[in-house]
Regions:
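Zn2+-dependent cytidine deaminase-like catalytic core
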Residues: 34-133, 305
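Short Asp/Glu-rich motifs
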Residues: 32, 110-111, 137-138, 206, ...
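Short beta-strand scaffold segments in enzyme catalytic cores
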Residues: 29-38, 156-157
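Residues that form or flank phosphate/diphosphate-binding pockets in enzymes
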Residues: 53, 82, 109-110, 136, ...
């Protein structure tokens, strides 16, 4: 049956797309397959910003055999000029007969326009098969274009009783090596990492990707976003050693400190000794950063929760009890009754 074949090839396109998840940010992960007479004659995936799109690679491999073939792709092909030519023009030029797409591209530059133009040029279009899988794969990209702000994933490692450190702030190690390895993977898949001066100063943290299995798949380290209201982080800190990594420091004061050229100071409004998070998120969005991985202590996390800015939590829970005097993963104090609870779903 045609439906079964369509599902089969779209599933393969999604698997191809996943190969780019570590290097494609801020672009979406896309895989494409060209099929003719029940045979795959071309396939490809988008590897990194500025490189050929999945459809372009697949159609190039298919060559002149593309005429009359079916193109399977998990995201609507682009129709605008960016760092690469529009895929739409090539699909029409290669005389593709049918295009099967999982989901529309929410980017306002596309968002259904390519589908209309494909149909206008006599190409049969099928939309919506494996849509949920496709949307999930590119949930951060989709969120950015639907809501005009980065998708925020907040990570916390804690004990069974919700503690992230003992009463002296000792936290090495509450969680397991497997958890820490998973954090490396999450960093590698992120467009940026957000933390605070307190977190960085405490451990002289680098907050980067170090595992070879993930590092080898990256083009660059994810940019680091630091909340440092009074610019307390010493210039000798490890985070400043890698001058190839983009660092944004959000502060409310002026300074004569001499930072390297990879460091951007962002003057940020503050209130009650707290930086304005909504200003920061809006600024980050303007830098074409479509998702943020939060690694911080309880104060920033609590502020993000209070401002309704956390889209997803990632909890690593260790089978340990640290007791009432240990430090909680949040510092929210305005909730005292069940009726004041903040609801989430698993």
């Amino acid at each position: 049956m045609k439906m079964d074949r369509d599902l089969y090839y779209l599933h393969k396109a999604l698997l191809l797309a996943k190969k780019g998840i570590y290097s494609v940010n801020p672009n979406p992960a896309v895989g494409a397959i060209v099929v003719k007479n029940e045979k795959i004659i071309g396939m490809g995936y988008h590897k990194s910003p500025g490189s050929a799109h999945a459809e372009q690679i697949a159609l190039k491999k298919a060559g002149d055999n593309s005429a009359g073939a079916t193109l399977y792709v998990n995201l609507e092909p682009c129709c605008h000029h960016g760092k690469t030519p529009p895929c739409l023009d090539l699909i029409i030029e290669k005389k593709i007969k049918r295009v099967v797409i999982c989901q529309k591209d929410p980017n306002p530059l596309v968002n259904g326009k390519s589908i209309k133009l494909l149909k206008k040029n006599g190409i049969d279009v099928k939309l919506g098969l494996l849509k949920n899988e496709a949307v999930s794969l590119n949930k951060k990209f989709n969120h950015y274009h639907l809501y005009n702000r980065p998708y925020i994933l907040a990570k916390t490692g804690m004990s069974l009783d919700g503690k992230i450190a003992d009463y002296r702030w000792n936290s090495k190690w509450i969680t397991s090596p497997a958890s820490r390895n998973d954090v490396q993977k999450e960093r590698a898949m992120s467009s940026s990492i957000l933390s605070t001066s307190s977190t960085i100063i405490k451990d002289d943290s680098r907050l980067n990707v170090r595992k070879k299995e993930y590092l080898s798949k990256l083009k660059i380290q994810p940019p680091l976003l630091i909340l440092d209201r009074k610019l307390k982080i010493p210039l000798s800190s490890k985070i400043f050693k890698d001058t190839s990594r983009q660092i944004y420091i959000f502060s409310s004061i002026n300074t004569n400190k001499k930072y390297k050229s990879n460091v951007i100071l962002v003057k940020t409004p503050s209130n009650n000794q707290k930086l304005n998070l909504k200003f920061i998120i809006k600024y980050v969005a303007s830098q074409n950063i479509n998702n943020i991985f939060v690694e911080s202590g309880p104060n920033l996390l609590s502020s993000l929760i209070t401002d309704n800015l956390v889209d997803e939590f990632l909890f690593y829970i260790a089978p340990k009890i640290l007791g009432n005097n240990s430090k909680s993963f949040n510092s929210i104090t305005h909730i005292n009754k069940l009726s004041q609870k903040i609801d989430y779903h698993i």
